[in-house]
Curated annotation (Swiss-Prot):
Role summary: Catalyzes the transfer of a dimethylallyl group onto the adenine at position 37 in tRNAs that read codons beginning with uridine, leading to the formation of N6-(dimethylallyl)adenosine (i(6)A).
Phylogenetic placement of the source organism: Bacteria, Pseudomonadati, Pseudomonadota, Alphaproteobacteria, Rhodobacterales
This protein's name: tRNA dimethylallyltransferase
Organism (species): Ruegeria sp. (strain TM1040) (Silicibacter sp.)
EC number: 2.5.1.75
Disulfide links within the chain: none
Length: 288
C-alpha cells in the first residue's frame, strides 16, 4: 500500500501504468495532498482535439491541480519522444515539483535513462517506410533492436527501421551511446501502477461506453473532415473505430467492441513492457 504522506514533497514523482489503471487519479491525489504540477507522459494525450477519446484530465480535474503538456498540440503535429523530452525539461527546473504520469513507456525511458542523439529522419526515408508493411519493416531489424521495442507497435518499429535506413546503424547501437539522463529514476519517487487483469479489463469494457456518453462521438464528428489515418493523432485507440462508425462501416456497438478489444491488447503490451523495463520502480495497486 502506498502511503502518500511518505513521498518527499520536494522530490519528482513518476507514475507509469497501463491504460485505465487509475494512474491519473493517483497523480491528482498526490498533487492535492502535497503540491506539484501534473505532467503528461502519454503520447495520445498531447493533441488538442481528443480530450474524451484519450481520457485526458477533465476541466474539473485541471481546476484541482496544475497540469502541463496536455492537449497542447494541433492534430497534424508530428511529435516524438525527443520532442516530449525537450518540452518536459523546463518543467523539471520550475518552482512546482513535477508529477509525471502516463502510459508511454518510451517517454519515461528517455527521461530516466537518457536519449540517443539520432539524426532526424529524411522525408524520403519516412515516405518509403510509410509504404511498407509492419512485417517488412520488422524483418529488416537486428535482433538486439527487436528485443528492445514493442514489435506490435508500428510507430516504434517504423522509427527503428528509419534510423537503420538513414544512418546505417541499428537503433540499439545508437541507444548504447546514449548520454546521461535528465532525471535518473533513483532521484525520484518512481511508481508503476499494477492492476489485476480481470479488474482492469472490467474497467476497460466500461470505459468506452462512458466515453460515448461523455461526448466521444461528437469529438470524432468534429474531426471527421480532417481525419487522416496516417497521422499519429488519428491512431489513438477509439478514433479509427468511431470514424468507421461515422462512415457507416460499423455500427456503434461494433465500434465500441473493437475499441475495447484494442484497448485490452494495448494494456497487455504496456504491462509486459513495464515489467521488463521498470524492474526497479515501486509497484503500487490502483487502490493505493
Amino acid at each position: 500500500m502506498l502511503d502518500i504522506d511518505k513521498i518527499p514533497a520536494d522530490q519528482p514523482v513518476l507514475i507509469a501504468g497501463p491504460t485505465a489503471s487509475g494512474k491519473s487519479e493517483l497523480a491528482l491525489r498526490i498533487a492535492e495532498h502535497s503540491g506539484g504540477v501534473i505532467v503528461n507522459a502519454d503520447a495520445s494525450q498531447v493533441y488538442d482535439c481528443w480530450r474524451v477519446v484519450t481520457a485526458r484530465p477533465s476541466a474539473e480535474d485541471e481546476s484541482r491541480a496544475a497540469h502541463a503538456l496536455y492537449g497542447h498540440l494541433s492534430y497534424d503535429t508530428l511529435y516524438s519522444a525527443g520532442h516530449w523530452l525537450r518540452d518536459v525539461t523546463p518543467l523539471l527546473k520550475g518552482t512546482k515539483r513535477p508529477i509525471i504520469v502516463g502510459g508511454t513507456g518510451l517517454y519515461f525511458l528517455t527521461l530516466t535513462e537518457g536519449m540517443a542523439d539520432i539524426p532526424a529522419t529524411p522525408p524520403e526515408v519516412r515516405a518509403e517506410a510509410d509504404t511498407l508493411s509492419l512485417e517488412t519493416l520488422a524483418a529488416d531489424l537486428d535482433p538486439e533492436t527487436r528485443a528492445r521495442i514493442d514489435m506490435q507497435n508500428r510507430a516504434r518499429v517504423q522509427r527503428a527501421w528509419e534510423v537503420l535506413r538513414a544512418t546505417g546503424r541499428p537503433l540499439a547501437e545508437w541507444q548504447d551511446d546514449t548520454p546521461p539522463p535528465l532525471l535518473p529514476a533513483k532521484d525520484c519517487t518512481a511508481l508503476v501502477v499494477e492492476a489485476e487483469r480481470d479488474w482492469l479489463e472490467t474497467r476497460i469494457r466500461r470505459r468506452f461506453s462512458m466515453m460515448i456518453a461523455q461526448g466521444a462521438l461528437e469529438e470524432a464528428r468534429a474531426m471527421q473532415d480532417r481525419y487522416d489515418p496516417a497521422l499519429p493523432s488519428c491512431k489513438a485507440i477509439g478514433v479509427p473505430e468511431l470514424m468507421a462508425h461515422l462512415s457507416g462501416a460499423l455500427t456503434l456497438e461494433q465500434a465500441e467492441e473493437r475499441a475495447s478489444v484494442a484497448t485490452r491488447q494495448y494494456a497487455k503490451r504496456q504491462r509486459t513492457w513495464f515489467r521488463a523495463r521498470m524492474k526497479s520502480w515501486q509497484r503500487v495497486s490502483p487502490q493505493a
